Each structure stands twice: as C-alpha cells, then as structure tokens.
From Swiss-Prot:
Binding locations of L-glutamate: 9, 42
Reactions catalysed, as given in the entry: O-phospho-L-serine + 2-oxoglutarate = 3-phosphooxypyruvate + L-glutamate; 4-(phosphooxy)-L-threonine + 2-oxoglutarate = (R)-3-hydroxy-2-oxo-4-phosphooxybutanoate + L-glutamate
Highest classification ranks of the organism: Bacteria, Pseudomonadati, Pseudomonadota, Gammaproteobacteria, Enterobacterales
InterPro entries, per the entry: Aminotrans_V_dom (IPR000192), Aminotrans_V_PyrdxlP_BS (IPR020578), Pser_aminoTfrase (IPR022278), PyrdxlP-dep_Trfase (IPR015424), PyrdxlP-dep_Trfase_major (IPR015421), PyrdxlP-dep_Trfase_small (IPR015422)
Essential cofactor(s): pyridoxal 5'-phosphate
Gene3D superfamilies membership: Aspartate Aminotransferase, domain 1, Type I PLP-dependent aspartate aminotransferase-like (Major domain)
Protein name, UniProt field: Phosphoserine aminotransferase
A GO cellular component annotation in the UniProt record: cytoplasm
Gene: serC
Modified residues (N6-(pyridoxal phosphate)lysine): 198
Organism of derivation: Escherichia coli O7:K1 (strain IAI39 / ExPEC)
Amino acid sequence: MAQIFNFSSGPAMLPAEVLKQAQQELRDWNGLGTSVMEVSHRGKEFIQVAEEAEKDFRDLLNVPSNYKVLFCHGGGRGQFAAVPLNILGDKTTADYVDAGYWAASAIKEAKKYCTPNVFDAKVTVDGLRAVKPMREWQLSDNAAYMHYCPNETIDGIAIDETPDFGKDVVVAADFSSTILSRPIDVSRYGVIYAGAQKNIGPAGLTIVIVREDLLGKANIACPSILDYSILNDNDSMFNTPPTFAWYLSGLVFKWLKANGGVAAMDKINQQKAELLYGVIDNSDFYRNDVAKANRSRMNVPFQLADSALDKLFLEESFAAGLHALKGHRVVGGMRASIYNAMPLEGVKALTDFMVEFERRHG
C-alpha cells in the first residue's frame, strides 16, 4: 500500500510506530490474553499505564512539582466551561483575549458563568492578519484570570510569546493544537489544557495542567467530572476514564521521549513549517494571508489563486496519498495540519505535489 499522509486538523495523524505497537498488542496486551480496552481502569495493570503516562508527560514538559496533571473527558470545549467553573472563585469577571475562532468559542461559553472582559487582539498589518503583541493586551484589575489560545487551528494564527504579566495574573491557555510541539514554561501559567486529538493521541482524552493553589475553588454547580479537585483527589478516575485513549497517549509520550523529546520536535516542526511556507511564499499560485510573526507551525492554511481549481487540487492530492487538505468551512481554501506525527517526508511530498500542480495549472 502506498504511503498515506494525513493532514487532518484532528483527529490527526498518529506516529506509525505507535499504531504498529497498538496493533500488535490489541488482542493480547501484556500477555493477559485480553485487550487493554477490556481491563479494569482500577486494576494494577492499567494503574501502571496511567502512572507511566503522567510521569512521561511531566518529563516531556518539565512540569513543576506544584502542578497537578489531570486526564479528563470533555475535550477543549469542556474546558471552556471547566476553567471559569474552577478558578473564578468569588470573582465575577475574567480577561479573555480574542485572536481567532477557538478563543471566541471559549468566550461564548464563559459568558454562561462570568462576565468576560474581552480584548480583541486581532489586527491587519499590510493586508495580512496578525495579533497584537502581549505588551499591548489590555487586562483588567479585578479579573480572576486571563485566558487565551496560543494556536488557532482554523485561522492558522499562533501566539508564540511567553506570558509575562506578573505573578498576580493567573494565565489559562488552550494548548490543544500546539502542546508538545515546542517547549513551554509551565510556571508562567495557572492552567494549561489540551484536547488529545492533535498532538497527544486519539480523541476522547483531555489533559489539564493546573497549579495546585488553584484547586478547591470550584463553583458549587460545577459538574463533578469537570471539578479539578475531585479529579485530582481521585487520580483522574472519579468515573471510568477513556482508557484506550489514555493508553495510546502513553505510547505517544514514549515515542516522543525516544525521538529526542519536545526539543527535537521543536526543531523538526520548524523545518516542516519553513519548507511549506517557503513554497507558498515563492509562488504567485498559492497564498497565505497571515503575518509571518503569527504564522502557525501546526496548521498552515493556504488558498489557490484560482479557487475554481480547489476541487481538482483536493482530488489529485488525495489520489497522491495526501489526505484531509480541505480548509475549514469558515475560511475555505486548503489547510495542512503538520503536527508532531507528520514526518518531514510528508511535508516534502506535499510541497512536491504543490510545485507540480502549479506547473500544470499555473
């Protein structure tokens, strides 16, 4: 079978080595004669999986000891509610920075629980979409926390700055599409959350990193499965967790460690992004409308000069083994999501196709 490269924004491509191991272990895991999907989450065998996954994740991101790591249900949208429900405390407002679709979605959900102070960070510079630098973000004095999304998958916009708003500002961030792709100074954040389906593992699992002094503040109406304190007190097993997603994510963590960790991913991801943006920038046939300072390394949207060719581009790229390149309905065009599991050879295959397609149709 020909090599297939999956450029889906999520659920996304998983490392081939991880899928191969999961396939080999699927029906007889650890010599038990059963699948990991069939064992009790409270049995010693799965407890070991959970403990190793947390340890490896902590190692990969150098998570400080005063932070808890939770393995949850609900995805990023669940955390849009969980963040205000857990850390508002006795305050009624929080700062929200709007830089794209997912930040706006978090704001919409937060309005159910508080009065968001919304700062629109979106700007246009020389006809290109950009984000105001953090030094220009206008935060309020009475906010319980500040929330932003470092990587907007749909808009292809990234905020790569590290927050530095002082120790009194609790920063909450949606890292769903950029977690583990580059080093993070976890100590600059109060809460980091990420849906698994892009850079961690299969859909169904969400990881939360929360500073321990923020526990114990949950609203009385907070559902128990979203309550950080309850999840922490029960080792993320207050109810039956998504065990297979947890197991597979653990395999991804081991794959990452075996391949140089987050620092190595950072370098490879930079190479992949430079290759793809280079083809776009050196062409009149393709275009990307995001300012270079805010271009995402994970999600690269681009348009063809003649949108009438979009359908043909998608058909021919799919036939060439380059799948899921259709852009989000909100922005149209194309989008290549090049998360950790996408090898450099996959991006090279895409850029070779793009050059050849332009030669034939440009």
